[in-house]
Amino acid sequence: MGSCGGKHTGKGAPKPYSRNFTDPWRKTPGRLFGTALIRFYQITLSSLIGNSCRHLPTCSEYAYEAIARHGLWRGGWMGFFRVVRCGPFGTHGFDPVPRELSPDLKWYMPWRYWRCSASRIGK
């Protein structure tokens, strides 16, 4: 039997598992603060509340990715409105974070982020 030298390459290399966004993103103070809040919620409160999200990715995963991709202000509003849409009479199903936001989503009009989802924007 061979021993593992710790250097995996190729197809057999183990991949780190994370339920959160793993692409590279700018580590600004606002983004780090927002993603840290989401991660704190995932580790502590989420286990007490249980699996109650009606979407995929879950609302906390969505908020984490939205903040990582689009910053604390835009991503925070997107995450907030996603949680609001997740109620009993709200939406459900696959609803990923859009890769790019349309130019009509201005920072001073956060109510427009209500309709912000990849399926609605088409990206």
Swiss-Prot record:
GO terms for cellular component: plasma membrane. It is found in: Cell inner membrane. It is a peripheral membrane protein. Keywords: Cell inner membrane, Cell membrane, Membrane. Residues 1-23 are annotated as: Disordered. The keyword Cell membrane applies. The keyword Cytoplasm does not apply. Signal peptide: none annotated. It comes from the Bacteria. Could be involved in insertion of integral membrane proteins into the membrane. Belongs to the UPF0161 family. PANTHER family: MEMBRANE PROTEIN INSERTION EFFICIENCY FACTOR-RELATED. This is Putative membrane protein insertion efficiency factor. It comes from Brucella abortus (strain 2308).
